[in-house]
From Swiss-Prot:
Protein name: RNA polymerase sigma factor RpoD
PANTHER family: RNA POLYMERASE SIGMA FACTOR RPO (PTHR30603), RNA POLYMERASE SIGMA FACTOR RPOD (PTHR30603:SF60)
Family stated for the protein in its record: Belongs to the sigma-70 factor family. RpoD/SigA subfamily.
Region (Sigma-70 factor domain-4): 608-661
Keywords: Cytoplasm, DNA-binding, Sigma factor, Transcription, Transcription regulation
GO cellular component: cytoplasm
Entry-linked Pfam families: Sigma70_ner (PF04546), Sigma70_r1_1 (PF03979), Sigma70_r1_2 (PF00140), Sigma70_r2 (PF04542), Sigma70_r3 (PF04539), Sigma70_r4 (PF04545)
Annotated region (Sigma-70 factor domain-2), positions in chain: 440-510
Lineage: Bacteria, Pseudomonadati, Pseudomonadota, Alphaproteobacteria, Rhodobacterales
GO terms for biological process, alphabetical: DNA-templated transcription initiation
Subunit note: Interacts transiently with the RNA polymerase catalytic core.
CDD domains: Sigma70_r4
Gene: rpoD
Organism: Rhodobacter capsulatus (strain ATCC BAA-309 / NBRC 16581 / SB1003)
Residues within the DNA-binding region(s): 634-653
Keyword Heme: no
Amino acid sequence: MAAKDIDDTKPDTAADEDASFDMSQAAVKRMIGEAKERGYITIDQLNAVMPPETVSGEQIEDVMSMLSEMGINVVEGEEVEESEGGEVVETGSGSREIAVAGAAGETLDRTDDPVRMYLREMGSVELLSREGEIAIAKRIEAGRNTMIAGLCESPLTFQAITIWRDELLSEEILLRDVIDLEATFGRSLDGDEGMEGMEGIEGPVVEGLDLETAEGAAPAARRPASDEPEYDADGNPISRIDEEEDDDDSSNMSLAAMEAALKPKVLETLELIARDYAKLAEMQDLRMSATLNEDGTFSVAEEAAYQKLRSEIVLLVNELHLHNNRIEALIDQLYGINRKIMSIDSGMVKLADAARINRREFIDEYRGYELDPTWMDRMSAKPARAWVTLFEKSRDKVEDLRHEMAQVGQYVGVDISEFRRIVNQVQKGEKEARQAKKEMVEANLRLVISIAKKYTNRGLQFLDLIQEGNIGLMKAVDKFEYRRGYKFSTYATWWIRQAITRSIADQARTIRIPVHMIETINKLVRTGRQMLHEIGREPTPEELAEKLQMPLEKVRKVMKIAKEPISLETPIGDEEDSQLGDFIEDKNAILPLDSAIQENLKETTTRVLASLTPREERVLRMRFGIGMNTDHTLEEVGQQFSVTRERIRQIEAKALRKLKHPSRSRKLRSFLDQ
């Protein structure tokens, strides 16, 4: 269908956005025909038909979307394979052979357009099928489960969970700070029974779902809004953030209601975890004692019971669906302790190197015996000269390092080797989940661009919109649950929209206005537009306040805030030879009249003071700061003249009496009215 649209495009209508590029060109048709035969097209071929100088990044993205709809993949370079004779045989149409002397491969056209570079790199990642999305989602889930299982082997995790339970009971923290409310509440509604063993996704699978038919598919997709932007009376675009949030408020429970519904069950689960952990801690102590003491034993049956109890606790922790911030805090705690252990290990290895002990031999003897109290005695009894040297020269340092290691072991509650294994398991699960999330994000970058294009010309650059949309996409990947049966793109669309509209509301204005105030402004504008149609005129603030059931002062405040800033360089007049800034009073500038009066007062004062004796003139100038940076006290003036302060006071009084004489005062009296 897309190919037919391209072929039927008329020359006079194909270049609405850019007259220099015409989809009906023979070169474009030929390119599409060859691409259909091969099933792919290279970036080089696109660049040849659409030069960077004449085609915008958005047009390139539109063409790439059309090609994708036709089943044509956009790849970095030609798919080539090397023949036995050293030649490179191209697998494209015509089976042309390209002889190469050395390394083959054409250099891609270079461009400094960031949008074009981004689109080129994005085009190299293939789109995911529904099965591919499910496979990646399962990898993310498996990585998270591996990470949670590792955390559950650390006593520090259960100590933290016990603290969180106590803080919840004492209401020091909210339930939303401990668990992911939406994910936990969604699971409780869905009921995971019978869903764990699904190979494919049964039920309401929404393949190729259109947004207008997505009712009930995604949590936030119950009432899809139009993608077309709305404009106010002045032609300015209006953000629809508040509309979308109103929809969310009407269709979703509030966080407080979710907390009230989930808190009893969560506290019950936390109580079970605390009870089981108390048993597990006793078994861990016995297990650790058996590890440290050669005569200690931990039977096979006890080990089986230990593993069973640990598995039950892992299941309980998974049921909680802990908040990502809490999981990250636990991981950071583990990694911090691991860095401390590595620092101690490094100190021990340095001492061994100084004693010329083979590093591999030292590590073999050291690892696994970090908490063994007999290790130093056994190693010092070795006949090798290097070991004897180590304990002769550095025994105190070795004892200090092992004492630090013992403190760490006592704090973590498990053997150091076991702790290292726990950290490795957590790192492995985190790495697997992070890699799977990265693949999911990269495969859906096109979705971000298609949504970001609808929000251009709203105060943010296109690349900024893409960046904010990518942030929303990453949040969608974190929260996506493949078991619900809808496609990832359907769910991610709402996260991307919310991220973009939030950023526009937060960053687009020259003078930043908080998002909640933007929502109130939009609600006020929308109500005003509705009342304009009803009553045939602009509503007054009083009418708006009554309609919205909002205080009148708040309505006036919002209307004042809603005004758009105007540039001081705005042209004024028909000829536009002056700017708005030319007509605005500068409060800091001195008026010419005031400047003339000040200058005249200065000259008159100088002439009047000159009629006094030099001593009297200087005393008055110093006392009142005339012609100086500051005035002076009687004591300071007296020090200048080497007389007492009383004498200065007398001179000052005499000089002021002279100035009051009509022959002098009449010259200054006119300035008193100014």
